[in-house]
Each structure stands twice: as structure tokens, then as C-alpha cells.
Amino acid sequence: MRIISLLILLLFIGTGSFAQKMIGYGGELSVLSAKPNVRIWTSKTTGFEFFGGIAAEVGDFKPNDMEIGFKYLKAIMYNRTDRTYFGLVGKWKMVNVYGETQKTSLPIPGILIGKEWYSKRINRKGFAIELGYQYGVKEFNVQNHLLQTKETFEEFPLILNLRYSFYKKR
């Protein structure tokens, strides 16, 4: 019972704080994508992020795919100059599986943990590192002249993001 009470306390501490209601505009580089994003901290401990951009596949590394999505972030440790948080990720990926001839799309859920450092003194710049796991598998049909075969696309499971943001108070 103590663990549940502690978890509830951690989830809701600081939800009414005005001091850290911030919005950040920035960019994110990951293993297979580059995305502009908007991160909104509604309190010291709760945030949301919306992103979208170009992506690639593990097999070809060509930036010919697209992805859009969101993150729900919950800080587990907060200091004046950094945050440690966990998050839930949901994204939709549009994939060119055989060049431009065959396309498919799939939802990809994930979880992550991140650390963000920021400076209030110099235009509120922020830098974050995120590490996590995502899962997405899609089976699709491929038409080859007279034959139709089934292929499977699997999303790369590792989330490794580096992000840079410019924050301002809301």
C-alpha cells in the first residue's frame, strides 16, 4: 500500500506549479530519423510532445519514410536545471517497403526514459537524451508479376534520441 501511495504522490506532485509551465520548440535526432518537435511542460512533472519528420529503415538507411507521433512525459526527478522522466510514445509510421512502388503504414507504441538538462540563463535552451523500446510489425502483400507473396516489416526496437530545444514560459 505504501508503494502505491508513493507512486500516486510522485505522479501528481507539482501539477499546479506555474514556474515550469513551458513550451519548447526544437529538433530531435534518433537512430533512424530526424524530426522537428514541440514539447509542452504543463507543470514541473507532466509534459507532452508532438513530433513528425523523415525516417529510414534499418535495411536501407534512405530517408524516404515519414513518421508522426506524440509522447506523454512524467518527471520522476526534477531539479532547477534538469529533469529525469519516463514516457509513453505513440507514433504512426508510413514506410516505403520496396522503393516507391509498395507502401504501408503501421502504429508503433513504445516506452522511454529520458534526462533533460536546460539553462534558464541563456534563452532557456534544453538538451535531452532518451532511451527506450518500441514495437511495430506489419505484414503486407507484394505483387510480383503473377505471384502474390507476404512480407513482414519490423520496426527497429531501440529508441535512442538526442534533442535540442528553445523554451519559453507560457
Each PLM stretch: what is its role?
Residues 1-4, 20:
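Positively charged n-region of N-terminal signal peptides that target proteins for export
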Residues 22, 32-34, 53-59, 77-79, ...:
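Sequence/structural signature of outer-membrane beta-barrel proteins
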Residues 22, 31-33, 65-69, 106-112, ...:
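Transmembrane beta-barrel architecture of outer-membrane proteins
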Residues 153-170:
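Outer-membrane beta-barrel "beta-signal"
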